[in-house]
C-alpha cells in the first residue's frame, strides 16, 4: 500500500471496502475501471473526469482494465484526502475570520489562548503559554493566518 492510504481513517477504508464489494458482482476481488466513477458518485465524492481517467491509468499498473481493492483505495484516497484538506482549510479560515474582528489578518495571542482553552480544557496556563510562545515565534503578540494554519494542522 502507498503512503496515501495512511491518510485515510479506518472508517473511510471500511466505506470504500463496502462500496468496492457491492460493485464486485462476481467476487473476483477486482472491479472494472469504468465503475470507479459510479462508486465515487454514490459516495458523494466530487471528482474531475479527466483527472480520474489519468489516475485510473496510473493506478491500474497491470493495464487489466480492472482495479484490485488496493488500487481502488489508492485512487479514491487521492480524491478523499484532497477534499478533506480543502474543507479543513476553509473551516480554519472561517474560524480565523471570526476572531480577526478588525479584519487586519491577525488575531491577538490572548484570543488564541482562549481558542486553545476551548479546544482542550485540560491544558494548564503554563502549557498554554508555552504553546503561544512557539506559535508567536516573533513575539509580536499577534498570530497571522499562516501561523494559525500551521498550529492547527501541524504543517
From Swiss-Prot:
Annotated tissue distribution: Present in both larval and adult muscles.
Entry GO CC: centrosome; cytoplasm
Residues annotated for Ca(2+) 1 binding in this entry: 60, 62, 64, 66, 71
Residue span, EF-hand domain: 11-46, 47-82, 87-122, 123-155
Gene Ontology MF annotations: calcium ion binding
Keyword Repeat applies: yes
Pfam families xref list: EF-hand_7
Keyword Repeat assigned: yes
SUPFAM superfamilies per UniProt: EF-hand (SSF47473)
CDD domains documented for this protein: EFh (cd00051)
Classification via PROSITE patterns: EF_HAND_1 (PS00018), EF_HAND_2 (PS50222)
Protein name: Troponin C, isoform 3
Organism: Drosophila melanogaster
Source species taxonomy: Eukaryota, Metazoa, Ecdysozoa, Arthropoda, Hexapoda
Gene behind the chain: TpnC73F
